[in-house]
């Protein structure tokens, strides 16, 4: 009998299906940072909060005023897990105290120095900053996929870095040739 290796979704986008009722994930686009036999981790990339980088810097280094440009850099709600922890997706090249290189020429940094670098004008110009992440236990994301909770879309750095946050979900769906407004809110199997 032929052994089939599991199909993992690392470095792909997850598009929440219209029937997704979990408010943490309804109408979201999630970048899958890791997916293996032990579970999965992703970052929701289309939910900007009312917080900006200026607000975060006020907490991290209150002795220094945040540069004006930091008021324009959105902080996204990356998911419901560890919502006080920051994650920054950015193109590979620069490394910080805690940087992991991911496929496709992007990196994930989790140390404060990446935020200071962005604020001070010498960090990665292209970035998505989130607080929190989405986490799935072993087999949980696989089960949600089998239940038609998500569509997958191949990663496109333009969607991550060049498309406005609020347009990313539709941009990923268009990449698949889909209009999410035309998909039924009822799920099923044929």
Curated annotation (Swiss-Prot):
Family from the record: Belongs to the UPF0301 (AlgH) family.
Protein's UniProt name: UPF0301 protein PSPPH_0476
Gene Ontology CC terms: cytosol
Any Pfam family the entry gives: DUF179
Organism per entry: Pseudomonas savastanoi pv. phaseolicola (strain 1448A / Race 6) (Pseudomonas syringae pv. phaseolicola (strain 1448A / Race 6))
Record-linked HAMAP family: UPF0301
InterPro entries: AlgH-like (IPR003774)
Domain of life: Bacteria
């Amino acid at each position: 009998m032929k052994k089939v290796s599991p199909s993992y979704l690392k470095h792909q986008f997850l598009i929440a299906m219209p029937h997704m009722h979990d408010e943490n994930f309804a109408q979201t686009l999630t970048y899958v940072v890791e997916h293996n036999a032990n579970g999965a981790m992703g970052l929701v990339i289309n939910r900007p909060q009312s917080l900006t980088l200026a607000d975060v810097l006020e907490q991290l280094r209150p002795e220094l005023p945040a540069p004006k440009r930091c008021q324009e850099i959105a902080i996204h709600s990356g998911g419901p897990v560890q919502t006080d922890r920051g994650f920054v997706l950015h193109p590979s090249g620069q490394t910080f105290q805690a940087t992991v290189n991911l496929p496709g020429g992007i990196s994930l940094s989790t140390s404060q120095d990446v935020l200071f670098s962005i604020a001070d004008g010498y960090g990665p110009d292209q970035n998505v900053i989130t607080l929190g992440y989405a986490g799935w236990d072993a087999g949980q994301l696989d089960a949600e996929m089998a239940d038609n909770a998500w569509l997958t879309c191949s990663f496109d750095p333009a969607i991550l870095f060049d498309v406005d946050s609020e347009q990313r979900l539709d941009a990923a769906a268009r990449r698949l040739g889909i209009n999410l407004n035309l998909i039924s809110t009822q799920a099923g199997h044929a």
